[in-house]
From Swiss-Prot:
It comes from Chlorobium luteolum (strain DSM 273 / BCRC 81028 / 2530) (Pelodictyon luteolum). One of its GO terms (molecular function) is chorismate synthase activity. Pathway: Metabolic intermediate biosynthesis; chorismate biosynthesis; chorismate from D-erythrose 4-phosphate and phosphoenolpyruvate: step 7/7. NADP(+) binds at residues 40, 46. Homotetramer. Belongs to the chorismate synthase family. This is Chorismate synthase. Keywords: Amino-acid biosynthesis, Aromatic amino acid biosynthesis, FAD, Flavoprotein, FMN, Lyase, NADP. Reduced FMN (FMNH(2)). PROSITE patterns: CHORISMATE_SYNTHASE_1 (PS00787). One of its GO terms (biological process) is aromatic amino acid family biosynthetic process. Its EC number is 4.2.3.5.
Length: 397
């Protein structure tokens, strides 16, 4: 089973991750990790922090001569901004009493609940750990599972469907065409847009919306679509709640900062339609097995993969740090005041797509390993091919 933990604060010396359970024999390069870190830093509407950081992972263990060795993989990503925060975020110092304390919580953030929960007299520890800066470590961790899946013919990609009121509604045809070549082909096309939209006109409208929001001291959220191609039938299970693949994917997506909604396929649209217009009919294709002319189930039936493209939609709320602050109060004096502003982005929807790609990768990898078992890449590859052949054979004759 693949599992990982992250550590580190936004303005501390570094972020780190320990990833356990990656099988031995997975060929991986440092560029496989750093490429995803660069993708996470891109996107129209990002803040000044992205001009400071140039994220790159240091691998401390678990990889030898370009291949995983089955032991835990430890990664470190240095925070270049740390040099500006050595006093405020010092691990060992006698300056605590003279360091400025933050006592005004920002609406929409973890500030208030976090300070009350952990009994701090300063909101800074909450801000620095709850920050989306932590997702850099998750992207690095997810890149390992993603590389493992890629070498088995399973690809993960995403695109931005909307930012604010700007919707990329005319890209369904190009989307299907791109997915026929694999989900990463879709991501490559999306990455050519600063807002990761497929439609050029929608992208221009989205950037204009971000510009207006920035001028007004406001922020924007949006909707991201994630696609996973090459997943065989039968990953996940219906027999216990914690083995349901849709619930595992939803949990991973909802654990990303600022994600407030998730659906598998067009779930909320399906809820408004009769069943005859929702469920995907079967077509038996000779030599290919079962196919569906539609995929309104989002590639999951009975909480298991159906063999179609897995399709997830995620809603990201607008970023909570506003240059035009909302009403708040001082926790120390209880006096009403306007909220404070912490350096942030105007819009991080494009980057959120990259993060979600990363967090769903271990979920799919674990479902695959649960089905196939195996400790070495060659063993797993052989078992997967035998399973795929068995699926093909079930519908021949």
């Amino acid at each position: 089973m693949i599992r990982y933990f992250t550590a580190g604060e936004s303005h501390g010396p570094a972020l780190s991750a320990i990833i356990d359970g990656i099988p031995a024999g997975v060929a991986i390069t440092k560029e496989d990790i750093d490429r995803e870190l660069r993708r996470r830093q891109q996107g129209y509407g990002r803040g000044g922090r992205m001009k400071i950081e140039q994220d790159s992972a240091e691998v401390l263990s678990g990889i030898r001569f370009g291949k995983t060795i089955g032991s835990p993989i430890a990664l470190v990503i240095r925070n270049r901004d740390w040099e500006n925060w050595t006093d405020k975020m010092a691990q060992f110092s006698s300056n605590e009493e003279t360091t400025e304390k933050i006592s005004i919580p920002r609406p929409g953030h973890a500030d208030l609940a976090g300070r009350l929960k952990y009994g701090f007299n300063d909101i800074r520890p909450v801000i620095d750990r709850s920050s989306a800066r932590e997702t850099a470590a998750r992207v690095a961790a997810g890149s390992l599972a993603r590389t493992f899946l890629r070498q088995l013919g399973i690809e993960i990609g995403s695109r931005v469907a909307s930012i604010g009121s700007a919707e990329d509604t005319g890209s369904e045809g190009p989307l299907r065409s791109l997915l026929e070549h694999g989900a990463e082909t879709l991501s490559e096309a999306a990455d050519r847009s600063e807002v990761r939209m497929i439609g050029e006109a929608a992208g221009i409208e989205a950037m204009a919306s971000i510009d207006r929001a920035k001028e007004q001291g406001d922020t924007l959220g949006g909707v991201i679509e994630i696609f996973i191609t090459g997943v065989p039938v039968g990953l996940g299970s219906y027999v216990q709640h914690d083995r349901r693949l849709d619930s595992q994917l939803a949990a991973a997506v909802m654990a990303v900062q600022a994600i407030k909604g998730v659906e598998i396929g067009p779930a909320f649209d399906n809820a408004r339609k009769p069943g005859s217009e929702v469920h995907d009919a079967f077509t038996l294709m000779k030599g290919e097995g079962v196919r569906r002319p539609t995929n309104r189930s989002g590639g999951l039936e009975g909480s298991m993969s159906s063999g179609e493209v897995i399709h997830i939609r995620a809603a990201m709320k607008p970023i909570s740090s506003l240059q035009s602050p909302l009403q708040s109060f001082n926790l120390d004096t209880l006096e009403p005041v306007l909220s404070r502003f912490e350096r942030s982005d105007t819009c991080a929807v494009p980057a959120a797509g990259v993060v979600i790609e990363a967090v769903v990768a271990p979920v799919i990898a674990n479902a695959l390993l649960e089905k196939l078992g195996g400790d070495h890449m060659d063993e797993i590859r052989e078992r997967l091919e035998r399973y795929r052949e068995a699926l093909r054979s079930a519908f021949t004759g």
